[in-house]
From Swiss-Prot:
Forms a heterodimer with SLF2. Interacts (via SIM domains) with SUMO1 and SUMO2. Interacts with CAPN3 and CTBP1. Interacts with SMC6 and ZNF451. This is SUMO-interacting motif-containing protein 1. The lineage of its organism: Eukaryota, Metazoa, Chordata, Craniata, Vertebrata. It comes from Rattus norvegicus (Rat). Residues 183-197, 532-553, 764-777 have a biased composition (Low complexity). Residues 22-31 have a biased composition (Basic residues).
Length: 1266
């Protein structure tokens, strides 16, 4: 089968894009019309219209050319030129292109040419034809991206830049050595002006310098990449090539400050797969170099370029670049050592137009593609590049775009999630500026971009938008400039970018007008760590660079003399200053890396982190989210940062600053003496030049700063535990007490006060005298004061929930918004009521806002769990594997599938009520039962427990079962859910409910008596009784609040268990009152049963718990009424009313046992308290229509029917005053002494309650004598 192509003769000039598009369409039509046409495979479209020689034409006027030969069928045709003249290999490409066929010993060829004079051509790569004419048509029509390009690729023409003025020396290009092979690249394409159509810029291999984008000068068209198989240069030791894996994400770009340069910025091509070891002087042992996975496909998900109008760019930019398509087999760059020691740095090396649209690092994660110029290092997101010559500054300052970073005029620039480090110092180039979103720079050094702030005399940071003009920024020589975003900068030395950290290992140098970072300084980003100081650089993305020449590959530890590089965010170590990467970093001294997720400490520093961050002396910078600082300037990472006096400056939102001219950013700023300018927000200043972070961070003058403001450091999961964490070393400075006294009038708190206040969050004091829990306590104090919703209770479960939330960067702000907005969110309120339910007779209001799950489950047919899945469950039951049974059922139960009844019975009887299961299995079983109950509520026919089983659990041997309380909660939940279900759907069928079956006073009065008996027994348990002086009472129903500070753990646990049992049994009694549709009759019957049990309760505190935990106000009124009626010498015939309460005041005596005979007034005090309970509950009975049936009550409440006037409620102010005065006189006469203040207060409160209940105006009452 022969392959052929057809070219139209009458296509016209190819300078017009529209004509080309028309010609391409005619080509397709001609191919479809030609009989026997075969799919194109390894062919080219060749435009023959410019040639003078005649071609044979068919009857349709089309030239048919056979380009296929038998010996060439298996290899693609890269370029076919059918002209008569012999063509050299270097001439087959257009003037500005470079081929990469065999470049091992050749020099790079550069040329310039007019784009308009270049013929159209097609390239064939990997047996896949790429029609550049069609490609351009697609580019203009906004269709699919170009096809991928692989080995033996030929590169399309570069844009026409001949009109651009270029001043500089390109002689360094002649010294660049080309390597031997070509690795796969991804083609990129951008739009240009209508007069000149730019093609895709593809890289040419070169040894050390990454290919620059098309925005550079045409003479600098292609900077080569290190090639795939090239060995180390002769100068360096024999280091085998490192495997690279590069996610072809966003493309880095540069912008040069030269005002005479205007070139269209193009996309940066992909780096090669493997990079030679290019370091010169350090041996690279081959046995320690691991391999890296190669096939890591990456799929671009977001557009790489923002629109021009959103970047503040000039409006005459020709067009926005197209999206870039990458091959699926493109490997990600993991480990790429770079060396630029042989590359000179020149001002005019790189010229980039200010009109270019750079990639948006904020939306698209930057790939480890590196634009590298001689002596200049640019770092994209997730990549680390280090230049031995230093970091380039622009003249008058450095401009960093709104994406994430800025560059001080002293010279350190850190990108979003990346780090740039100079091991030998900072070199200044009069005009190199790195742009993240858009860069505009003036020759004066101060420029304003859409997100960039620049000052020639200081350091300015910008988060996403920075406003700067040459005259409107605050600048102090050697000081700090604060931008509008959430950035800050310290003239003392380090600059920390968004979610990244720069750390100085104790060695910071400051140059006039900026910040210079010495070889001992470290900048650490959230996911990328670069470290110099002996040549150690780490990146979480896997790029490791060592100025000493020791590269480390992914997830393997390698150590060379003097420097250790650890990759992949796992471990990094260097003897002088290590920067652990994000997540899991461990550092030890002497250059020995530790393995992942082990905490280790080296002398001179305290490594402590919520995750796995270890620090060493001389300055350690932990990464994302969890940081501890050691002396010498340690700066924690993302979110809320702390800064030590050593000169570390974090950024992002909540920024602490150190003394010596540090200015925190927006939000809450702290200011320390020494030329610090606080930003908007609240400024807190601490003595000694220590500035706590905004909101939550604290600093110590010795360089010890606690971790992020939102991360409380507790012994359980973060910093130190008594058994497995080394103590703080002696080098950690002791934080003075004055640091607790910050601005805003915060009172001084001693260490004991702080530790007692946040006892779950503090750690035990270490043995070393110079070590203390002060930083942790201080930070915990500030965190709790400013974020009360993060307060950790004594519950370990709440500790486990709150700590991971606060460890996330920015979680404080998010939770604050939820706390403010969620209160007024009706669905959130509804869900809250679902877990915090009021008494039973109010529960029907919960259905006013149906749950989303309820709405979605309507109309779906319920089915049992499929047999195949059920067989898996039965297998676990047969194998006696309860945990597997519970876990399978947890997965299989859904709104559409319910478990069989025998399975539920097995869960209850054999797992939940088993005496041999662990607590975890019991909790899993309980959660499974709750899930089944929520999705498929039990009814009277399907319920799997009975009263006999409940009696066994509450009275017999079941009292010792560990799942007893969980089972009782499940029982009450089934009673309540069934009661509410019938109440909502079938009001008239309450007698069919489970509660009516087991708790009806008419049908099962003995069951109600059993509940009362269990309730009184739980109340009178010894463990439930606290000392009298610890009791706090409340007049209304609720849980008794008692202090348990002096109780031992075991009695305290039993006491809490009894409290849970009391609350559940009180809920059962409240259901029993409502279930018979006659609440008054039911409450009278239950009160008669209770009377004898209440008299047997020995202590007042126990009786108080009995009444305060009672949920039914009607039942409490009836019980108290019966007690008072029996205590009166002459019983009254008045019904339950206010007049009856006044009668009880002066005619009743206490029938209840007094706890002490010496304090007779306490008996009367309890009597007055019970009268208060009676009046309070009586108001609930009236206003909530509790005497009416629960079926009728809903309509009464919705219609807001006022309660009917009751006989005996028409009392007056005179009646109240007369009875209260008579009661006081009676007490004085009986006690023989004046009333104690406590009793006087309760009598006065009783009078106010009577006024309120009778709706009397207190202003008309005479002056009361107390």
């Amino acid at each position: 089968m022969e392959d052929f192509i057809v070219i139209s003769d009458d296509s016209g000039s190819e300078s017009s894009a529209g004509t080309r598009s028309g010609r391409a369409r005619r080509l397709r039509r001609a191919l479809s019309r030609t009989p026997g046409a075969l799919p194109r495979r390894t062919v080219d479209f060749i435009d023959l219209t410019r040639e003078t020689r005649t071609r044979a034409k068919d009857r349709n006027g089309l030239c048919v050319i056979d380009l296929t030969r038998s010996e060439e069928e298996n290899r693609p045709i890269a370029t076919l030129d059918l002209t008569l003249e012999p063509v050299a290999s270097s001439q087959k490409e257009p003037p500005s292109l470079q081929t990469c066929t065999n470049l091992s010993g050749k020099e790079m060829i550069e040329a310039q040419g007019d784009r308009g004079t270049q013929p159209a051509a097609q390239r064939v790569i990997n047996n896949d034809p790429v029609d550049l004419d069609l490609l351009e048509e697609n580019m203009f029509e906004g269709s699919r991206p170009p096809t991928s390009i692989s080995q033996d690729s030929v590169y399309p023409p570069e844009p026409n830049c001949s009109s651009i003025t270029y001043k500089g020396d390109l002689s360094f290009l002649t010294s660049l050595q080309l390597s031997s092979d070509v690795s796969p690249f991804s083609s990129t394409s951008n739009n240009s002006s209508s007069s000149s159509n730019q093609r895709t810029s593809l890289p040419c291999p070169q040894q050390d310098v990454p290919c620059q984008s098309q925005g550079l000068l045409c003479s600098l068209q292609a900077l080569s990449y290190p090639l795939r198989g090239s060995p180390c240069p002769p100068r360096a030791s024999s280091c085998p090539p490192q495997a690279l894996s590069c996610p072809p994400q966003a493309l880095s770009s540069l912008s040069c400050p030269s005002q005479t340069v205007q070139c269209q910025l193009q996309a940066l091509p992909q780096p090669p797969q493997e990079v030679p070891c290019s370091t010169q002087n350090v041996p690279c042992p081959q046995q320690n170099i691991p391999s890296t996975p190669q096939d890591l496909p990456w799929h671009p998900r977001h557009p790489l370029y923002p629109s021009q109008d959103t970047l503040g760019l000039p409006q005459d930019v020709p067009g926005r670049p197209q999206n870039v398509s990458y091959p699926q087999d493109m490997t990600q760059l993991q480990d790429m050592p770079w060396s630029l020691q042989d590359m000179p740095l020149s001002l005019q090396d790189v010229l980039q137009s200010l009109q270019d649209v750079p990639p948006l690092l904020g939306d698209v994660p930057q790939s480890p593609e590196v634009m590298q110029l001689p002596g200049y290092m640019t770092q994209s997101s997730r990549n680390v590049i280090q230049s031995s010559a230093g970091v380039i500054r622009s003249s008058g300052g450095v401009m960093q775009p709104s994406g994430c970073m800025m560059q001080p005029s002293g010279g350190v620039t850190q990108s979003l999630r990346s780090a740039i480090q100079s091991s030998g110092g900072v070199m200044q180039s009069s005009g190199v500026t790195q742009s993240l979103r858009s860069v505009m720079q003036s020759s004066g050094g101060v420029m304003q971009s859409s997100g960039v702030t620049q000052s020639s005399g200081g350091v300015t940071w910008s988060l996403r938008s920075v406003m700067q003009s040459s005259g409107c920024m605050m600048q102090s020589p050697g000081g700090v400039m604060l931008s509008a975003g959430d950035m800050m900068q310290s003239s003392g030395g380090a600059t920390r970018s968004l979610r990244s950290m720069m750390q100085s290992s104790g060695c910071m140098m400051q140059s006039p007008g900026g910040v210079t970072q010495s070889s001992g300084s470290v900048m650490q980003s959230l996911r990328n760590v670069i470290q110099s100081s002996g040549g150690v650089t780490q990146s979480s993305g896997g790029v490791i660079q060592s100025s000493s020449g020791v590269p480390q590959s992914l997830r393997d530890r390698m150590q060379s003399p003097g420097s250790v590089s650890q990759s992949s965010g796992d471990v990094i170590q260097s003897p002088r200053g290590a920067s652990p990467a994000s997540g899991d970093v461990i550092k030890s001294q002497g250059g020995m890396p530790r393995s992942l997720r082990d905490r280790m400490q080296s002398p001179g520093g305290v490594p402590q982190s919520s995750e796995d961050v270890i620090q060493s002396a001389g300055g350690v910078s932990p990464a994302s989210g969890d940081a501890i600082q050691s002396p010498g300037g340690v700066s924690p990472a993302s979110g809320d940062a702390m800064q030590s006096s050593g000169g570390v400056t974090p950024s992002l939102g909540d920024v602490p600053q150190s003394s010596g001219g540090v200015s925190p950013a927006s939000g809450d700023a702290m200011q320390s003496p020494g030329g610090v300018t606080p930003s908007l927000g609240d400024a807190m200043q601490s003595p000694g030049g220590v500035s706590p972070a905004s909101g939550d961070a604290m600093q110590s003058p010795g360089g010890v700063s606690p971790s992020l403001g939102d991360v409380p450091q507790s012994p359980g999961n973060m910093l130190e535990s008594l058994g497995n964490t080394p103590n703080l070393s002696g080098d950690v400075s002791h934080v003075p007490q004055e640091l607790l006294d910050l601005a805003k009038g915060r009172p001084k708190l001693s260490l004991n006060a702080v530790q007692n206040r946040h006892s779950p969050m503090t750690i035990s004091a270490p043995s070393s005298p110079s070590c203390s829990a002060n930083p942790l306590s201080q930070q915990s104090e500030f965190s709790s004061e400013k974020r009360p919703w993060l307060t950790v209770s004594n519950s370990s479960a709440r500790e486990e929930r709150s700590l991971p939330q606060s460890a996330t960067p920015g979680s404080a702000q998010i939770q604050g918004q939820i706390a403010q907005a969620g209160v007024y969110n009706r669905p959130c309120l509804h869900r809250l009521k679902y877990f915090l339910r009021p008494p039973v007779h109010h529960l029907f209001f919960q259905t006013l806002i149906p749950d989303k799950d309820t709405r979605e489950s309507k109309g779906q047919k319920l089915e049992p769990i499929p047999h195949r899945r059920l067989r898996m469950v039965t297998n676990t039951i047969e194998e006696n594997f309860p945990l597997g049974t519970v876990q399978f059922l947890m997965d299989f139960v859904s709104p559409q599938h319910y478990p069989p009844r025998e399975i539920v019975a097995h869960i209850i009887q054999k797992i939940l009520l088993s005496g041999s299961e662990t607590v975890d299995v019991l909790k899993e079983a309980y959660m499974l039962l709750m899930k089944i109950q929520q999705l498929h509520p039990a009814n009277a026919k399907t319920v799997e427990w009975d009263w006999k089983l409940l009696t066994y659990v509450m009275e017999e041997e079941g009292q010792t079962l560990p799942g007893r309380v969980l089972f009782l909660r499940y029982v009450v939940q089934t009673l309540e859910d069934d009661f509410q279900q019938i109440l909502r759907r079938q009001r008239q069928h309450l007698q069919q409910s489970i509660a009516n079956t087991v708790l009806s006073c008419d049908k099962q009065p003995h069951n109600v008596r059993d509940v009362i008996k269990w309730l009184v027994k739980a109340v009178t348990e010894n463990a439930l009784t606290p000392p009298q002086d610890e009791t706090q009472t409340s007049p209304g129903p609720g849980v008794l609040k008692t202090s348990s500070d002096h109780l031992s753990p075991q009695p305290n646990l039993a006491r809490n268990t009894n409290q849970l049992i009391v609350c559940q049994l009180q809920r059962m009694l409240s259901i029993a009152v409502e279930v018979d549709r006659t609440p008054t009759c039911s409450s009278n019957k239950i009160a008669e049963m209770m009377f004898g049990f209440v008299l047997d309760i020995p202590e007042r505190s126990q009786r108080e718990m009995f009444f305060t935990t009672m949920e039914s106000h009607l039942l409490r009124c009836k019980v108290l009424e019966i007690i008072f009626l029996h205590s009166c010498e002459t019983p009254t015939r008045l019904p339950l009313s206010l007049a009856q309460a006044l009668y009880f005041l002066n005619n009743s005596t206490s029938l209840l046992k007094c706890q002490s005979d010496k304090s007779q007034w306490q008996t009367w005090d309890e009597l007055v308290e019970h009268l208060q309970f009676l009046l309070s509950s009586y108001q609930h009975v009236l206003r909530e229509h509790l005497r009416s049936s629960v079926i009728d009550r809903k309509d009464l409440i919705i219609k807001r029917i006022k309660p009917k006037p009751q006989q005996g409620d028409d009392i007056t102010v005179v009646d109240v005053e007369k009875q209260i005065e008579a009661f006081r006189s009676r007490l004085v006469h009986i006690l023989g002494e004046p009333l104690v203040p406590q009793l006087q207060d309760k009598v006065h409160l009783l009078k106010l309650l009577l006024f309120y209940a009778a709706d009397l105006n207190p202003d008309t009452e005479p002056a009361s004598e107390r």
